[in-house]
């Protein structure tokens, strides 16, 4: 039977690991969202340029 200190250590390590995983996952989600935003902005800019050039002709 583990002692109270051992249980506390196990709980602390489990909590720390879960917080670390949540932080990594949050960073991943944030970077994916930023990537999609930049892709969308680039596509809109390109569409605007194409519209300008087709309007000139």
Swiss-Prot record:
The keyword Membrane applies. The keyword Signal does not apply. One of its GO terms (biological process) is mitochondrial cytochrome c oxidase assembly. Keywords: Membrane, Mitochondrion, Mitochondrion outer membrane, Transmembrane, Transmembrane helix. One of its GO terms (cellular component) is mitochondrial outer membrane. It is found in: Mitochondrion outer membrane. The chain crosses the membrane at residues 15-37. It is a single-pass membrane protein. Residues 38-57 are cytoplasmic. It comes from the Eukaryota. InterPro entries: COX14. Residues 1-14 are mitochondrial intermembrane. Along with COA3, core component of the MITRAC (mitochondrial translation regulation assembly intermediate of cytochrome c oxidase complex) complex. Core component of the MITRAC (mitochondrial translation regulation assembly intermediate of cytochrome c oxidase complex) complex, that regulates cytochrome c oxidase assembly. Requires for coordination of the early steps of cytochrome c oxidase assembly with the synthesis of MT-CO1. This is Cytochrome c oxidase assembly protein COX14. It comes from Rattus norvegicus (Rat). The lineage of its organism: Eukaryota, Metazoa, Chordata, Craniata, Vertebrata. The gene is Cox14.
């Amino acid at each position: 039977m583990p002692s109270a200190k051992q249980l506390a250590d196990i709980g602390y390590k489990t909590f720390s690991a879960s917080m670390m995983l949540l932080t990594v996952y949050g960073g991943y989600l944030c970077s994916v969202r930023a990537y999609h935003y930049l892709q969308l902005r680039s596509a809109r800019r390109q569409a605007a340029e194409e519209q300008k050039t087709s309007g000139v002709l």
